UniProtKB/Swiss-Prot annotation:
Family: Belongs to the AP endonuclease 2 family.
EC number: 3.1.21.2
Catalytically driven reaction(s): Endonucleolytic cleavage to 5'-phosphooligonucleotide end-products
Enzyme class (EC, first level): hydrolase
SMART domains recorded: AP2Ec (SM00518)
Entry keywords, A to Z: DNA damage, DNA repair, Endonuclease, Hydrolase, Metal-binding, Nuclease, Zinc
Lineage: Bacteria, Pseudomonadati, Pseudomonadota, Gammaproteobacteria, Enterobacterales
Chain sites annotated for binding Zn(2+) 3: 182, 229, 231
UniProt keyword annotation of Transferase present: no
Record-given protein name: Probable endonuclease 4
Amino acid sequence: MKYIGAHVSAAGGLANAAIRAAEIDATAFALFTKNQRQWRAAPLTTQTIDKFKAACEKYHYTSAQILPHDSYLINLGHPVAEALEKSRDAFIDEMQRCEQLGLSLLNFHPGSHLMQISEEDCLARIAESINIALDKTQGVTAVIENSAGQGSNLGFKFEHLAAIIDGVEDKSRVGVCIDTCHAFAAGYDLRTPAECEKTFADFARIVGFKYLRGMHLNDAKSTFGSRVDRHHSLGEGNIGHDAFRWIMQDDRFDGIPLILETINPDIWAEEIAWLKAQQTEKAVA
């Protein structure tokens, strides 16, 4: 079964994220559990936690259908010790918030070397950061998102994701989220079913589908291999509809949150309905 949704706003209270997801007929959703552009956040209150859990129960969202995202400020591969420590503390807080909310996944951008250390050293720092966070939390899986490779951001090669996973001690609590726009911008072609087969065969060989814990379904304004991260609505960008139809008809993508981060929230309900219809097409065929 496919879990299909979008990254919805939690403005006005975390429970509102579940309500907004239900309003667009989503069977999955993503959210920030705190302001993503600030380091600090007030601790979660018992009331906030209870309201969120009640809303998820009311609208039938389990933790397997929810993919929280951490703060954009966090860099788990930071080359400067003091800044790395700050990022690690913030990441642990994000993991603990998920734990309190009964959420089992936390999606994050791996990190950037800022042209100050090697890729290898940065990847090792990211893995070490994950190990520290896993040691201080329970029940939450660290879900590494592939990047488009802008600037000095790592994670744009499947080999980067594999190297991080290799350095994580508890393999049962690490996974990956593949963003289609990021993959395309990083040089993994998705424009035809044949290219999708090739790209995900590479993914299976280098990383492994057992680590796939979520996806971001985004078309791309950016061009193929450009290393530029610019999302677009499904079918309106340089990837096109075929990739998303292909994903919907492949059962390797079942049972994980498939999250839209496309640029027009006004048509998320339409995009979700279209994705669901592609899945139905296969059942009818």
